[in-house]
C-alpha cells in the first residue's frame, strides 16, 4: 500500500467511532434537556403554589365581595376578610364552585397545573376544593404548602397542593 492510502477497515472503524460519539452526545443532550424542562416545570409549580396560598390568606379577592355577586365575574378568589383571617362565606362559595374546577383553577393562578386545597382545624377538614393528586403514583409530582390563619377566631390550616403528571406537558 502506498503513502496516503487508507484501508477499508480503517475507514469503517473511524466511521463507527464517529457515529458512536454522535449517539453518545445526542443521548446526553436529550437527558440534560429533559432534566432542564422538568426543573423549569417544578419552578413554575412552586411559583403557582406560593401565589395561590398568598392570595387565599392575604387577599379578599377582586371584587372584595365576590362571594355575594355573580361568581363568574370575579377576577380573583381571595378568602381573607383581612390578612390571615379567612371568611367562612368566601370558602363556602369557593367550595360550591367545584363543578367549575377548570375555570376556577385558572382564576386561582394554577394555570396548567392541577390544584387541591383544604381548610382544616385541629380535628377535621372544614372545606375542600379541587382535585387531589395521587401521592402513591410515581408519575405524579406534588408540591404542598400550608398556611395558618383564623376562621371564626379559631386557628385553622389552609393546605394547598399543586400537582402535575411528570413527563406530560400540562
Residue ranges, per PLM feature:
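Long, compositionally biased, intrinsically disordered regions
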Residues: 23-170
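N-terminal single-pass transmembrane signal-anchor helix
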Residues: 1-29
